[in-house]
Amino acid sequence: MTTEKPLNLLISNDDGIFALGVRTLANTLAKAGHQVTVVCPDRERSATGHGLTLHQPIRAQIVEGIFDPQVTAWSCSGTPSDCIKFALSAVLFTRPDFVLSGINHGSNLGTDILYSGTVSAAMEGLIDGITSIALSLTSFSSQDFQPAANFAVDLIAKLARHPLPQPTLLNVNVPPVKSEDMAGVKLTRQGLRRYRENFEKRLDPRGKSYYWLVGEVIEEIEQPDHLHLPGHIPTDVQAIGDNYITITPLQYNLTDVQGFSDLNQTQWFDP
């Protein structure tokens, strides 16, 4: 598989440098002819959000034997966001054309994105003005990351041929089915996916208490009316349920425009 023009790609994840998802993604993109650099956490960092390491040093080293020889790979002691910052500042001599994060082992749908290290790594690329892609396989049991990796090859080829007017983050979720069983690709809006959670109390061998966060997904909750989201565009949660690959454009500006308007009308504050 070859491409029209090799691209410089930076890849990270939150599942760690040894995860099958990032290995499949990086190797597939390298075989497609791209220049691939991987900088990943040295261990599992799921659900770390957009955290940064500020009060201790970050250690990083080149790793060999995990990826195809044409892939340059680093492991980093920091968070996914640290990895992208470190790569852009200290590893790469050429600005990447795209930042990719994943392929995550598990979905990043709805409000998952607020906790996701996968999405946060991609968001870090966007903050630096680079169009970025977060990729997730919506299953914890499936090990077949190849369809998602193949889609990434096609997606960046399309983005290279038809650049977006402004940098954005594309949050991509891929259903855990064979390529021939996928319904297609849909542009979606972010859904609202919450969890019924509780902290399970346990005792260690010395009789001291500790807690595990446990819970179950509430798949879909109706969006509040005041958000005025376009009802004709399906949510990522809905479309994944119908076996579509979902693409949700995201930005880092979290301003609630309707809330701004509502507060303005209250006249609580002097003009």
From Swiss-Prot:
Reactions it catalyzes: a ribonucleoside 5'-phosphate + H2O = a ribonucleoside + phosphate
Keywords per UniProt: Cytoplasm, Hydrolase, Metal-binding, Nucleotide-binding
Localization per Swiss-Prot or TrEMBL: Cytoplasm
Pfam families to which the protein is assigned, alphabetical: SurE (PF01975)
GO molecular function, one term: 3'-nucleotidase activity
Source organism superkingdom: Bacteria
Cofactor(s) the protein needs: a divalent metal cation
Enzyme Commission numbers on file: 3.1.3.5
A GO CC term attached to the entry: cytoplasm
Cofactor binding annotation: Binds 1 divalent metal cation per subunit.
Record-stated family: Belongs to the SurE nucleotidase family.
Job description of the protein: Nucleotidase that shows phosphatase activity on nucleoside 5'-monophosphates.
NCBIfam families: PRK00346.1-4, PRK00346.2-2, surE
Name listed for the protein in its UniProt record: 5'-nucleotidase SurE
Native source organism of the sequence: Gloeothece citriformis (strain PCC 7424)
Top-level taxonomy: Bacteria, Bacillati, Cyanobacteriota, Cyanophyceae, Oscillatoriophycideae
Gene: surE
